[in-house]
């Protein structure tokens, strides 16, 4: 079976969904920009030799509809002979895109794939056109479709206090801002055209979603966003609404050698699981455990974790049950996470994997694990190993 390696991994800056940098940019353009950038950064690879493009996107309607992967590839002037498919596993879409490409390469059905994902939550809101089947309530609690309430449930089951959530959210912003100031994100962000507050076209090379002024004290004044009577989850401890895309160049290790391209990491294992929709945010725990089992590793073997921060109330129970509470500051989301950067649904799996690989290189780490919860009760995880 072929070894699958990541040769390159990049992303756009994360733009605010409400009147942000990409308010006049379309999701297809953000995607095409990264496709072109990956090819330009790796000139020994010709676009015509790509076997397939796998692109994650959740709200596949309006500008994100009609197979956005193909639309973006055509905009990027990738040869018409290269196919492209849009993947949807809700929040885990672009990580699923990575898994799909990896399996094609492992089985020898492909050698080189472009992988990534996008979501423009400013143009296509998360709830746009959603119409749950009325009979679903016979099998699943109605609140299971309301992500904030599932986070409330997790916090109550695991004893996660409001103060713990506020502290974690403040940490996310502080670490993301520190990474921005130190230049840690420069290796992953591709400058991307957008418009500033005055409508002037400019290149953005930083995440505009981060709020460096965030403090625990300020967060403590916010009202509960989902359960106004007895809730603890606020807008400040939830992932920000943002627009963005991320992309990875994935290939067999043998093809990378032929092209003279240096692999940055290999995929050691992959896993996806289901869980109770009412505690959908718990998915990273069984997914991570399964991925670790497949890799022949334990949580203590992992040097760096990237865990998508859907909500502080959601990620803290996962950290707790993976036995990592005492190692948060050494191993978990060292450059902040989605609370600070946002969670553009179809983008986030590739985004956290990209950030993880860059962190592994900076820390000279051997193993890293990226994992996410998924709406309606799933979890997905990938173990990476430095080459």
Swiss-Prot record:
<dbReference type="InterPro" id="IPR016039">
    <property type="entry name" value="Thiolase-like"/>
</dbReference>
<dbReference type="InterPro" id="IPR020613">
    <property type="entry name" value="Thiolase_CS"/>
</dbReference>
<dbReference type="InterPro" id="IPR020615">
    <property type="entry name" value="Thiolase_acyl_enz_int_AS"/>
</dbReference>
<keyword id="KW-0442">Lipid degradation</keyword>
<feature type="active site" description="Proton acceptor">
    <location>
        <position position="343"/>
    </location>
</feature>
<keyword id="KW-0963">Cytoplasm</keyword>
<comment type="subunit">
    <text>Heterotetramer of two alpha chains (FadB) and two beta chains (FadA).</text>
</comment>
<dbReference type="GO" id="GO:0010124">
    <property type="term" value="P:phenylacetate catabolic process"/>
</dbReference>
<comment type="similarity">
    <text>Belongs to the thiolase-like superfamily. Thiolase family.</text>
</comment>
<keyword id="KW-0276">Fatty acid metabolism</keyword>
<dbReference type="InterPro" id="IPR020617">
    <property type="entry name" value="Thiolase_C"/>
</dbReference>
<dbReference type="Pfam" id="PF02803">
    <property type="entry name" value="Thiolase_C"/>
</dbReference>
<protein>
    <recommendedName>
        <fullName>3-ketoacyl-CoA thiolase</fullName>
        <ecNumber>2.3.1.16</ecNumber>
    </recommendedName>
</protein>
<keyword id="KW-0808">Transferase</keyword>
<dbReference type="GO" id="GO:0005737">
    <property type="term" value="C:cytoplasm"/>
</dbReference>
<dbReference type="InterPro" id="IPR002155">
    <property type="entry name" value="Thiolase"/>
</dbReference>
<dbReference type="Pfam" id="PF00108">
    <property type="entry name" value="Thiolase_N"/>
</dbReference>
<keyword id="KW-0443">Lipid metabolism</keyword>
<dbReference type="InterPro" id="IPR050215">
    <property type="entry name" value="Thiolase-like_sf_Thiolase"/>
</dbReference>
<feature type="active site" description="Proton acceptor">
    <location>
        <position position="373"/>
    </location>
</feature>
<feature type="active site" description="Acyl-thioester intermediate">
    <location>
        <position position="91"/>
    </location>
</feature>
<comment type="function">
    <text>Catalyzes the final step of fatty acid oxidation in which acetyl-CoA is released and the CoA ester of a fatty acid two carbons shorter is formed.</text>
</comment>
<keyword id="KW-0012">Acyltransferase</keyword>
<dbReference type="InterPro" id="IPR020610">
    <property type="entry name" value="Thiolase_AS"/>
</dbReference>
<dbReference type="InterPro" id="IPR012805">
    <property type="entry name" value="FadA"/>
</dbReference>
<dbReference type="GO" id="GO:0003988">
    <property type="term" value="F:acetyl-CoA C-acyltransferase activity"/>
</dbReference>
<dbReference type="InterPro" id="IPR020616">
    <property type="entry name" value="Thiolase_N"/>
</dbReference>
<comment type="pathway">
    <text>Lipid metabolism; fatty acid beta-oxidation.</text>
</comment>
<dbReference type="GO" id="GO:0006635">
    <property type="term" value="P:fatty acid beta-oxidation"/>
</dbReference>
């Amino acid at each position: 079976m072929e070894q699958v390696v990541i040769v390159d991994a990049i992303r756009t800056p994360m733009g605010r969904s409400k009147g942000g940098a990409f308010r006049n940019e379309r999701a297809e353009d953000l995607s095409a920009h990264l496709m072109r950038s990956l090819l330009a950064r790796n000139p020994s690879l010709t676009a015509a030799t790509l076997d397939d493009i796998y692109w994650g996107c959740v709200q596949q309607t309006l500008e994100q509809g009609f197979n956005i992967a193909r639309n973006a590839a055509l905009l990027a002037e990738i040869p018409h002979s290269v196919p492209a498919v849009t993947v949807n596993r809700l929040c885990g879409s672009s990580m699923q895109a990575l898994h799909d490409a990896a399996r094609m390469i492992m089985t020898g059905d492909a050698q080189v794939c472009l992988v990534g994902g996008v979501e423009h939550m400013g143009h296509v809101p998360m709830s746009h056109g959603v119409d749950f089947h009325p009979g679903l309530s016979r099998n699943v609690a109605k609140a299971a479709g309301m992500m904030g309430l599932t986070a409330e449930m997790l916090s109550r089951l695991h004893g996660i206090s409001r103060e713990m959530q506020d502290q974690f959210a403040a940490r996310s912003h502080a670490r993301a801002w520190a990474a921005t100031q130190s230049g840690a994100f420069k290796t992953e962000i591709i400058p991307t055209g957008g418009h500033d507050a005055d409508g002037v076209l400019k290149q953005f090379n930083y995440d505009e979603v981060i709020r460096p002024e965030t403090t625990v004290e300020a967060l403590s004044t916010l009202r509960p966003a989902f359960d106004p009577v007895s809730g603890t989850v606020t807008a400040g401890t939830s992932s920000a609404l943002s627009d963005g895309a991320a992309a990875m160049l994935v290939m067999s290790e043998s093809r990378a050698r032929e092209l003279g391209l240096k692999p940055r990491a290999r995929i050691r294992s992959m896993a996806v699981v289901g869980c109770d929709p009412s505690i959908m945010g718990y998915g990273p725990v069984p997914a991570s455990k399964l991925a670790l089992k497949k890799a022949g590793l334990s949580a203590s073997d992992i040097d760096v974790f990237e865990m998508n921060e859907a909500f502080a109330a959601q990620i803290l129970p996962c950290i707790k049950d993976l036995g990592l509470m005492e190692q948060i500051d050494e191993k978990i989301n060292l450059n902040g996470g989605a609370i600070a950067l946002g969670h553009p649904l179809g983008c986030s799996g590739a985004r956290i994997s990209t950030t993880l690989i860059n962190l592994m290189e900076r820390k000279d780490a051997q193993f890293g694990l990226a994992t996410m919860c998924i709406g309606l009760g799933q979890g997905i995880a990938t173990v990476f190993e430095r080459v």
